[in-house]
Amino acid sequence: GATNHGLVMFFDWSGSMQYNLTQTLKQLYNLVWFCDRVKIPYRVYAFSDAYEGAPSYSRVVSEEILVTQNPDNKSDLDVSGFRLIEMFSDKMRKNETADMMHYWYMMGEYYGGYRNWRDNGYPMQPPKNLHLGGTPLNHAIVAAMSIIPSFKTKNGIQKVNAVFLTDGVSHAVTRKISGEDINGYNKESYITDKITNTTITSDTKNSRYYSGEKQTTILLQLLKKR
């Protein structure tokens, strides 16, 4: 039944999405309404690297901030330069969801050059933390490997689908927590998921860069095995 399923969604809040934000938000809202209608647990996160202040493992200032990595695992991919911002969840009341849908949509209209203010409401100038930046899709996939199993356990469900609403190519995760660079000319790169004991090697021979796109493919394969 529906109660055995859940949905975790990740929304690309980046500069390349500027003129596609409102249309993509409409797609997102349809998914949220579907989850509410069939009563399945869900979470929606925006991913961004423009959030004010570099995230710090040693300076978590609020219980509302969840760190998905252990900084002592020096060989792990370092995805500390981005944030996930929770947009929606099944824990919100109906009026809270409606209000937040309006606020996110008005911010999308602001970036899209919206003009018909009188009839449909005024666009909102986004707060500094929600300015558009790069596309840390790969960073979000790495975080999802912690978030989705935890979400599954907390909700007592068997199957969780992940949805990534994005338009473009991610920039690569280029270093380990130790600071070691994983990018280089003619250098074979591989990523190991120690939980599932799966290693996937990227085809980077004779290629100058370990591209974000190749890394996305590897990370999605690893996420699927979770």
Predicted region positions:
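Acidic, glycine-rich A-domain
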Residues: 1-226
